[in-house]
């Protein structure tokens, strides 16, 4: 006798995401449950989420990992898909997930390839694709590390499967949005580096972390990993990614000097 279809919850966090949310929620409207943990949006985020039948909860922001764990704890379905407000499931990925959950999945957690949009171009080279994310797992099988910055990955100790179709990341439509994110994220990472004593106070550490490392990352990703095949947008992305690395170590160094 075939096993019954597994139910699916969508776990999301949000803050002023009215521009992204309709597109994202439309791609998961078919899920059994949508949970959105909001940290104090001033726009129509809550109204939009509820129009898609989402359960919305306010929780003061305490870090990305902490906030996402709150969302995971509120999910009640057999399986959970952790989704950012600017990510969209392609039709092919939706069908792949539905097919997977219609039977008994072989693994308890699955990687999903993510395709990133940068200034209107889909980035397919330079180490940015396939940008695999561990997002689909049995309820309770994974949690995010807390206090490790904005890019915490769900922690899961067992074998993991891989899905084949893309999740689309509508990341940075404008330079202003990109710079705002990178400024905020680099400050968050810098505070963590400072707490760990990695604030580059010695001259060799400073030169490596703030100068040589960003340069090496650019050369490796842009040339050796073929980032140049993504055109001008790829060049801008890899320059800015190296600048982001520079920023986080400069900010950590400044914190170590008591100047930030």
List PLM regions with ranges:
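Catalytic-site signature of metal-activated, phosphate-bearing donor transferases
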Residues: 66-72, 90-259
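Acidic helix N-cap motif at the loop->helix transition within catalytic regions
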Residues: 22, 43-52, 92-93
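Short aromatic/hydrophobic "clamp" motif used to bind/position activated sugar donors
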Residues: 80
């Amino acid at each position: 006798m075939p096993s019954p279809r597994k139910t699916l919850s969508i776990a999301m966090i949000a803050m002023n995401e009215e521009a992204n949310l309709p597109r994202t929620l439309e791609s998961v409207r078919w899920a059994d449950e949508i949970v959105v943990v909001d940290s104090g949006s001033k726009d129509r985020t809550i109204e939009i989420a509820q129009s898609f039948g989402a359960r919305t909860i306010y929780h003061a922001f305490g870090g990305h990992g902490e906030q996402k764990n709150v969302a995971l704890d509120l999910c009640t379905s057999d399986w959970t898909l952790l989704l950012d407000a600017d990510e969209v499931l392609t039709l092919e990925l939706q069908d792949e997930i539905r097919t997977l959950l219609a039977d008994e999945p072989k693994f308890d957690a699955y990687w999903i390839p993510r395709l990133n949009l940068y200034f209107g171009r889909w980035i397919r080279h330079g180490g940015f694709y396939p940008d695999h994310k561990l997002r689909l797992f049995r309820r309770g099988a994974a949690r995010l590390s807390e206090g490790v910055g904005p890019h915490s990955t769900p922690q899961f100790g067992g074998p993991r499967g891989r899905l084949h179709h893309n999740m689309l990341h509508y990341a940075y439509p404008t330079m202003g949005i990109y710079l705002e994110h990178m400024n905020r994220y680099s400050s968050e990472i810098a505070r963590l580096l400072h707490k760990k004593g990695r604030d580059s106070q010695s001259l060799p550490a400073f030169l490596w972390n703030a100068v040589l490392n960003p340069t090496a990352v650019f050369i490796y990703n842009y040339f050796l990993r073929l980032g140049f095949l993504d055109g001008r947008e790829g060049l801008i992305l890899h320059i800015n990614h190296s600048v982001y690395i520079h920023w986080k170590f400069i900010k950590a160094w400044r914190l170590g000097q008591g100047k930030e």
